[in-house]
């Protein structure tokens, strides 16, 4: 049974690598944010705004526990999910966790072009964006680093790099993957 949780900051490549890894392993991929949006028929941003952070994080935890019961699956979490309640401990208990570690400057270059799709980043100037990323990573790193594995996901700029990363992840997780 395979149950892999990909964690990391927004823009780390959780969805990109998760889809590619799941395809390689011939198992389903679940993006926790998409799962929540599908269930509640609202975007994560709308749910966050309407319910407030505490209520949203409780909902997120419940949905994490729901998908955490699925077998033979790759799951990407929201960037904040590992940092609340006992979510990291839970994921480590029921599956294999991988923290996609990305240099803040690489995250900056990825998020800079995707600012409009991420409400929390809209309106931030370049220097503010980099500071925001660095500060958020400092707060979240202690949670992310509780993952079973840490994988440097700096190089995901084209199909070849994604494929290389998938093969490296397969090797890294070899003890847990028998496909």
UniProtKB/Swiss-Prot annotation:
Amino-acid positions noted as binding substrate in the UniProt annotation, renumbered to this chain: 33, 57, 79, 140
Location in or out of the cell: Cytoplasm
Primary location class: cytoplasm
Function: Catalyzes the specific phosphorylation of the 3-hydroxyl group of shikimic acid using ATP as a cosubstrate.
Positions of Mg(2+) binding: 15
Domain of life of the source: Bacteria
Biological pathway: Metabolic intermediate biosynthesis; chorismate biosynthesis; chorismate from D-erythrose 4-phosphate and phosphoenolpyruvate: step 5/7
Family in the record: Belongs to the shikimate kinase family.
Gene Ontology terms describing biological process: amino acid biosynthetic process; aromatic amino acid family biosynthetic process; chorismate biosynthetic process
Quaternary structure and partners: Monomer.
EC number of the protein: 2.7.1.71
GO cellular component: cytosol
Protein's name in the database: Shikimate kinase
Cofactor(s) the protein requires to work: Mg(2+)
Cofactor binding note: Binds 1 Mg(2+) ion per subunit.
Disulphide bonds in the chain: none
Annotated organism of origin: Bacteroides fragilis (strain ATCC 25285 / DSM 2151 / CCUG 4856 / JCM 11019 / LMG 10263 / NCTC 9343 / Onslow / VPI 2553 / EN-2)
Catalyzed reaction equations: shikimate + ATP = 3-phosphoshikimate + ADP + H(+)
Keywords linked to the UniProt accession: Amino-acid biosynthesis, Aromatic amino acid biosynthesis, ATP-binding, Cytoplasm, Kinase, Magnesium, Metal-binding, Nucleotide-binding, Transferase
Binding-site list for ATP: 11-16, 118
UniProt cross-references to InterPro entries, sorted A to Z: P-loop_NTPase, Shikimate/glucono_kinase, Shikimate_kinase/TSH1
Organism placement in taxonomy: Bacteria, Pseudomonadati, Bacteroidota, Bacteroidia, Bacteroidales
Molecular-function GO terms, alphabetical: ATP binding; magnesium ion binding; shikimate kinase activity
SUPFAM superfamilies per record: P-loop containing nucleoside triphosphate hydrolases
């Amino acid at each position: 049974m395979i149950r892999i949780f990909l964690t990391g900051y927004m823009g780390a490549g959780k969805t990109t690598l998760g889809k590619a890894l799941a395809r390689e392993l011939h198992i389903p991929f679940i993006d926790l944010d998409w799962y929540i949006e599908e269930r509640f028929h609202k975007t994560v941003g709308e749910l966050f705004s309407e319910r407030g952070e505490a209520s949203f994080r409780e909902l997120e935890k419940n949905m994490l526990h729901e998908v955490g019961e699925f077998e033979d699956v790759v799951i990407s979490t929201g960037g904040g999910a590992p940092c609340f309640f006992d979510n990291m401990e839970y994921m480590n208990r029921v599956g294999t966790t991988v923290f996609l570690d990305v240099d803040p400057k690489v995250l900056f270059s990825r998020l800079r072009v995707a600012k409009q799709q991420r409400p929390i980043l809209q309106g931030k100037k370049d220097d503010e964006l980099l500071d925001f990323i660095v500060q958020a990573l400092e707060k979240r790193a202690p949670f992310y680093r509780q993952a079973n594995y840490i994988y440097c996901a700096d190089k995901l700029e084209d199909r070849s790099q994604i494929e290389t990363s998938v093969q490296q992840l397969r090797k890294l997780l070899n003890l847990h993957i028998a496909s």
